[in-house]
Structure formats: structure tokens, C-alpha cells
């Protein structure tokens, strides 16, 4: 394990390089930071850090820059995530509370995360597996066509137009609505699917064909894998850091167009409140080896509904970015859990 002073030197190198994008020299470090030692001692510490692979010397400079390994140690030794200001927290809460439905929550979340971090933001649509059915509404469009609206406790709204076998009046529609809500309301999705499949066999024969059609549509909505969708924002932010990517920017943009890559980056964040950081090759995506990915899960309490995070250069403000990701995830979880 590195001694504490060398860790402080590494921390100072990372912080200065993130701010300036210029290789950092020992004299500059000694002048800018209260390290309590001479430039010569700092120079010796930097030599030791370089030998152990935490920093490296670009060909064109006498200064040093962090390596993947150096960034990793810096992140692992963070004493805490930098808290957002009260104004920032209030702005996040106000912006997200303006959402009108679940799709709007996702759209606002991904835009907000991109703006706060100035990186590429990715938000996974929530999984229904931990959700419950809040209400099912049926509206008559004409005697042979109904509109079915399924609402979950996380705010997801699914609408389906349903053609039924024979004409129905408002009284029958009311009965069908009552049967569906009486059987499914409040049930977790994983339980509701089984109940819905068996429901038509429990009603009188004249309602059975209509209820069979409706429960088939309900099952399709409940079983749809919404969590395989992601929202993306802020790809233009990568151009601000194009110098960090050398010749790899095009490959990064191409990788971010692949849904499976995005899901791989953030879908593994399976805990709320815990922020994960993957640096360089830790992303396991060759095109993203010059990036870092910061992600967390969001949801209702400990139940994770999805993941969110950002993709940016390794030279990023890790404490600030981690704080923003955690804060947005926290407020999204609270919003989805609100009645």
C-alpha cells in the first residue's frame, strides 16, 4: 500500500490534471498544494508513483499524468462523495417534479444528468418486475373497440386499443373494469400475470370472450421488457473532451449507438445509493477503453428498477460527477415512489 504522502501527491496530480489537461510537474505541485515537503521530495514521490504504474510521462513533457491505475486508486481512496449545494439539490428536485408521466421522468432525468455532469448521460427505463398494478381503466371508443389503460405504482402508463368479439354496452364495460381491478390492483407484476391468465375461467360465460381478449392485452403489457430500453443525452459533450480520446472519438460514438452496450454499462448497477466507477479497460468495451463510466441503480427503497449513469473521459471530476449521479438517482427513486 502506498504511504499517505504519496497518495496525497497522486491526489494532487489527478486534481490538477483534471482542471488543466496539462502534465503536472513537481515544482507546480509543491507550489499549489500544501504537501509540507520540498519539490525534491515531491519529485522522488512522483518517481516512485511512476515506477508503480500510477502516473506516466507523455513524450512531449517533463510533467506527469495519471494512468488508469492512478485514477482507480484516486477513486478508491476518495474519503467521500462531494455533496451538491442546496441550490443544486433544489433545482434537481424542481426539474424532475415537473414530469407528467414515466417517459417524461426518464427524458428529464437523462437531460438533467448530462447538463449537471457535462458528460454523456444514460438512463435505463425501469423494469416492471418490482412494480405493482395501481389501476386499470377501460374506455369505450365504439361498441366493438375499447381503450385499455394500465397504470403501475412507478408511474408507467401503457395504453392499448382492443377490438372485442361482440358489441358491449357501458354496463358490461363497467363489469370488466371491476373484474380486472378487483383481481389485479395492488398486485406485483410477477404475481398479476398469473392471476390475469386464470381470470377468464372464473367469470360467467357471456363475459368470458371479452375478458379473455382484455387479459391477453394486459399480459402483453405486463410482460413487455421495458428495461431493455435506454435514453441517451449529451453526446455533444464528448466533443469538448475530444483531445482526451485521440483517434477514438468516432469509435466511442459508434459504441454508444449500440443499445446492448449501453445496457451493459449501466444495467449492472444493481444497488440504489451505491455508485460504481469503471475506468478505462474496466468497462470491458474495447471502444470505450479511454473512457470512464459512473453508474448507480435507482428505484423504490432497496428495490432497483433500473440503472443510470454517465460516460466521459478518464480525465473527469470524479467526486462531482459521482455526487450528481447519486443525487439524480435518489430523486428519481423518490419521485417514482410518491403517491
UniProtKB/Swiss-Prot annotation:
Keywords noted in UniProt: Repressor, Stress response, Transcription, Transcription regulation
NCBIfam families named among the record's database cross-references: hrcA
GO biological process: negative regulation of DNA-templated transcription
GO MF annotations, alphabetized: DNA binding; DNA-binding transcription factor activity
Similarity comment: family membership: Belongs to the HrcA family.
Keyword flag Zinc-finger: no
Gene for this chain: hrcA
Protein name: Heat-inducible transcription repressor HrcA
PANTHER family linked: HEAT-INDUCIBLE TRANSCRIPTION REPRESSOR HRCA (PTHR34824:SF1)
Oxidoreductase found in the keyword field: no
Function summary: Negative regulator of class I heat shock genes (grpE-dnaK-dnaJ and groELS operons). Prevents heat-shock induction of these operons.
Family matches, as Pfam families: HrcA, HTH_DeoR
Domain of life: Bacteria
Organism lineage: Bacteria, Bacillati, Actinomycetota, Actinomycetes, Frankiales
InterPro entries reported for this sequence: DeoR_HTH, GAF-like_dom_sf, HrcA, HrcA_C, WH-like_DNA-bd_sf, WH_DNA-bd_sf, WHTH_transcript_rep_HrcA_IDD
